[in-house]
A protein has these predicted regions:
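Catalytic-loop of the protein kinase fold
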Residues: 192-214
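C-lobe/activation-segment region of protein kinase-like
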Residues: 213-305
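Short Cys/His-rich micro-motifs in 6-15 aa windows
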Residues: 26-37
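Short, cysteine/histidine-rich loop/knuckle motifs that typically chelate Zn2+
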Residues: 5-8, 25
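Conserved alphaE helix
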Residues: 179-191
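Conserved structural core of kinase catalytic domains
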Residues: 141-182
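ATP-binding glycine-rich loop module of kinase domains
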Residues: 73-139
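Juxta-kinase regulatory segment immediately upstream of eukaryotic protein kinase catalytic domains
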Residues: 39-89
Length: 305
């Protein structure tokens, strides 16, 4: 596990498409120190080797997974009822005081003691979700599955969610080729249709709030549910904000590969969203046909060394 902090404000640093560090909070940019670069490359290589081994089915998946988790860190929490929760985690990310831990079978979100109401707001955002009676695409799997809440001894609150197999934060994968950004875009267009059906503005669609499985092309809008706006003050302007954010995300994840994208894809990403998510999805379908030659499963290249 690695955690790179901004020397200016203490926020979590991200890695851009050119391999430099930047801070989402204060905008500071910097380069890796030699020791940080070695640590980052080793960690990333371990993750990608594990994913490659699973994908190619040429290696013992169990041993690959054990190798991956051999370098995991451990964090412990004392609960108010006198129990201890100890978790091994591969990755952590802090955003606006909320720390997310990627464990083997779960994803944990820890809210600060002085802001525990944010945990309740987070869950309230999820409770606003509703799905069509005939959910033929099983879209419920594109959203977090809540497992439990734990009140901690120090006043913090821990929320636990299910982590499906081989699901990782999108930010972990760096710059992606256009065909991979496109399948992520397809999943997010589906997700935005659910948000509109539920009359929700999410407000936080970005590389750390979206988790993906690169083998099944599955995506989950996991994070930032406390930023949702409910059906009581919902308008079509709100759904267009969701659609603008997914366009910004697609451009971000392509990074240095953006110049390789079909012109139809780039034109769509730079265009204003349609009046609603359903019309926007229809427009996106035309981009898939005209820009990529139709829908097909593209094996994700995991060689990001």
């Amino acid at each position: 596990m690695i955690s790179l902090k901004c020397k200016n404000c203490g926020g979590e640093m991200s890695v851009d498409g050119s391999g430099n560090l930047y801070c989402d909070y204060c905008g500071t940019k910097s380069a890796f120190r030699d020791d940080e670069l070695i640590q980052y490359k080793n960690f990333r290589l371990q993750v990608l080797n594990y994913l490659r081994g699973v994908h190619d089915k040429k290696a013992d998946g169990t041993s690959h997974e054990e190798l991956l988790w051999a370098n995991a860190e451990t964090v412990s929490f004392a609960t108010k009822d006198g129990n201890d929760i100890t978790v091994r985690y591969l990755y952590s990310h802090e955003e606006e005081g909320v720390t997310t831990y990627l464990a083997r079978n779960s994803i944990l979100c820890v809210f600060p003691a002085q802001e525990i109401d944010r945990a309740a707001i987070w869950l309230s955002g999820l409770e606003l979700l509703s799905f069509p009676p005939a959910d033929v695409k099983n879209l419920q799997e594109c959203f977090p599955k809540f497992l439990g809440r734990y009140d901690l001894e120090d006043g913090r609150v821990l929320l636990s969610f299910e982590r499906p197999d081989n699901v990782f934060p999108l930010s972990m994968f760096g710059s992606l080729a256009p065909e991979h950004a496109a399948w992520i875009m397809s999943r997010l267009e589906n997700i935005c249709c659910v948000l509109e059906y539920s009359q929700i503005q999410h407000g936080g669609i970005h590389a750390d709030s979206v988790f993906i499985n690169p083998f099944t092309h599955h995506a989950i809008l996991f994070g930032d549910w406390e930023t949702t706006r409910s059906r009581f003050n919902y308008s079509l302007h709100d759904t267009r904000k969701n659609l603008r954010q997914l366009r910004e995300l697609a451009l971000h994840v392509m990074g240095m590969h953006v110049g390789e994208a079909p012109k139809e894809f780039l034109a769509f990403l730079k265009s204003e969203p349609a009046e609603n998510a359903y019309q926007d999805f229809e427009r996106w379908d035309r981009v898939i046909e005209d820009g990529f030659g139709g829908r097909r499963f593209a094996k994700m290249d995991l060689d990001f060394e």
